[in-house]
């Protein structure tokens, strides 16, 4: 039986950057080590932790693999942070969240190349 990857150590209400910093610091890892695992500059990772920048999907996956976390859960957290940054001041954002929650299948993209 395949081993299930661990999920996050800190609950989702914590902002992504703060959560990532807590994860890194809990393992007593310097920025440079985690940044190197994602092939990114440590200044960029620092800005991600401060909530000033976002990871790319590839960086997200690399860091999740480095920490042995579920890549889908990690990427979902990145998407939530991206949504929050892009739509924080939009009064319709909360309604959009409820629409996604109530009927997520309607908003799923289908692979057009599937047979």
What kind of region is each of these model predictions?
Residues 19, 44-47, 73:
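Residue-level recognition of specific faces of alpha-helices
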Residues 5, 39, 56-74:
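DNA major-groove recognition helix of helix-turn-helix/homeodomain DNA-binding modules
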Residues 2, 73-115:
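Short, charged recognition helix plus adjacent turn
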Residues 27, 38, 48, 66-67:
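Core residues of bacterial helix-turn-helix
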Residues 41, 52, 67, 77-82:
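The DNA-recognition helices of helix-turn-helix-type DNA-binding domains
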Residues 2-26:
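A short, Lys/Arg-rich alpha-helix, primarily the initiator
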């Amino acid at each position: 039986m395949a081993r299930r990857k661990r999920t996050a150590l800190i609950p989702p209400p914590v902002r992504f950057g703060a959560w990532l910093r807590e994860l890194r610091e809990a393992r007593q890892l310097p920025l440079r080590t985690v940044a190197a695992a994602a092939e990114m500059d440590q200044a960029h990772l620092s800005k991600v932790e401060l909530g000033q920048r976002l990871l790319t999907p590839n960086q997200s996956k690399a860091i999740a693999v480095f920490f042995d976390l579920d890549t889908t859960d990690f990427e979902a957290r990145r998407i939530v942070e991206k949504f929050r940054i892009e739509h924080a001041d939009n009064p319709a954002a909360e309604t959009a969240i409820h629409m996604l929650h109530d009927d997520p299948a309607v908003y799923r993209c289908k692979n057009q190349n599937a047979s």
